[in-house]
């Protein structure tokens, strides 16, 4: 699977069960009518209960140069330190939106399908916030790669 390049995303939530976030590349568009994304989340992950109970999330697609933030959200760093490392806005669902992301998709989880060790979260997009940073970041062959031309 390391040969499948993918955008790097930080998935965030905030709600009754608290604030949490993790790095994910297993994210993709499902349909534009209605606008829907999917996010894959391991049920064994420490953040799984928070996302499962809050039922909202924001997909923050990272820009070139945000590798350190991706690594921070992909590790065992306490949540308060993860969120303190960047500037955030609050989206319409109450989820944190990364100010310097390429784009943020504010979503409600509309359906969950379990496959093996993971849940596939189908996410109905409530709002989209495009940022001014034009260069994307992808994960390919177990390393980061900056897109050298504007992504959008």
From Swiss-Prot:
Its EC number is 1.5.1.42. It is an enzyme of class 1 (oxidoreductase). Keywords: Flavoprotein, FMN, NAD, Oxidoreductase. Induction: Up-regulated by the nitrogen regulatory protein C (NtrC also called GlnG) and repressed by RutR. One of its GO terms (biological process) is nitrogen utilization. HAMAP family: RutF. Catalyzes the reduction of FMN to FMNH2 which is used to reduce pyrimidine by RutA via the Rut pathway. This is FMN reductase (NADH) RutF. It comes from Shigella sonnei (strain Ss046).
């Amino acid at each position: 699977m390391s040969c499948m390049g993918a955008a790097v995303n930080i998935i965030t939530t905030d709600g009754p069960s608290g604030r949490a976030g993790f790095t994910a590349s297993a994210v993709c568009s499902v349909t534009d009518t209605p606008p829907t994304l999917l996010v894959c989340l391991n049920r064994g992950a420490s953040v799984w209960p928070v996302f499962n109970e809050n039922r909202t999330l924001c997909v923050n697609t990272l820009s070139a140069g945000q590798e350190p933030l991706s690594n921070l959200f992909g590790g065992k760093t306490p949540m308060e330190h993860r969120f303190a490392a960047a500037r955030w806005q609050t989206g319409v669902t109450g989820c944190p939106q990364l100010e310097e992301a390429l784009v943020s998709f504010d979503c409600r989880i509309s359906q969950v399908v379990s496959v093996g060790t993971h849940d596939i979260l189908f996410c109905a997009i409530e709002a989209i916030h495009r940022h001014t940073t034009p260069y994307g970041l992808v994960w390919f062959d177990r390393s980061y790669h900056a897109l050298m031309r504007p992504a959008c």
